[in-house]
Amino acid sequence: MIPAYIPNPAAALLGGGTPVDFGKCAKDGRRILGDGKTWRGLIGGIVVGIIFGLMQIFLYNYFNLEFLPKQTIITVCALATGALLGDMVKSYFKRRLGKDRGAKWPIADMYDMVVGSLVLMTLALLVTGNLNWFTENFDSVGFLIATIIAILILSPLLHRGTNIIGYLLGLKDVPW
């Protein structure tokens, strides 16, 4: 999940400039995504996530770190891209519900990137015929369940921690 956890904070650091929705509004009169989703943040976040994923591939191979999932270029790119796409889908629905940028939406805010990254990775593996990636990395049901539990516990903690740091650094308007 490293390539999925990195893009959101990287997008906040590198963001700014032209919004992904180009300032356009949906039929309800509200912005499609809002000013918080920019092309610079989207592209920068994905690139940084991919770089971290490539480092994970290198470390796995060089140091034989078998406790890490054996990532591929496909999984790294899908995880990094899916994390930010999941965040944008969540932002779209937040706007439809009338929630402002930075407004709390607890469950969605914590797991949007997890859902987006895992859905896109699964689709990418399906399209490329590499669904065996799951059985290669999760050789037992117990390990798969332990991984899911770790993701469910770590995601909110990492989300909250990075948001507090972003707030303290002046990169976010709110600490959540």
Swiss-Prot record:
Keywords: Cell membrane, Lipid biosynthesis, Lipid metabolism, Magnesium, Membrane, Phospholipid biosynthesis, Phospholipid metabolism, Transferase, Transmembrane, Transmembrane helix. The chain crosses the membrane at residues 41-61, 73-93, 114-134, 138-158. Its main location: membrane. Its cofactor is Mg(2+). It is a multi-pass membrane protein. Its EC number is 2.7.7.67. GO terms for cellular component: plasma membrane. It comes from the Archaea. Pathway: Membrane lipid metabolism; glycerophospholipid metabolism. It is found in: Cell membrane. Pfam families: CarS-like. GO terms for molecular function: CDP-2,3-bis-(O-geranylgeranyl)-sn-glycerol synthase activity. It is an enzyme of class 2 (transferase). It catalyses: 2,3-bis-O-(geranylgeranyl)-sn-glycerol 1-phosphate + CTP + H(+) = CDP-2,3-bis-O-(geranylgeranyl)-sn-glycerol + diphosphate. GO terms for biological process: glycerophospholipid biosynthetic process. Catalyzes the formation of CDP-2,3-bis-(O-geranylgeranyl)-sn-glycerol (CDP-archaeol) from 2,3-bis-(O-geranylgeranyl)-sn-glycerol 1-phosphate (DGGGP) and CTP. This reaction is the third ether-bond-formation step in the biosynthesis of archaeal membrane lipids. Belongs to the CDP-archaeol synthase family. This is CDP-archaeol synthase. The lineage of its organism: Archaea, Methanobacteriati, Methanobacteriota, Stenosarchaea group, Methanomicrobia. The gene is carS.
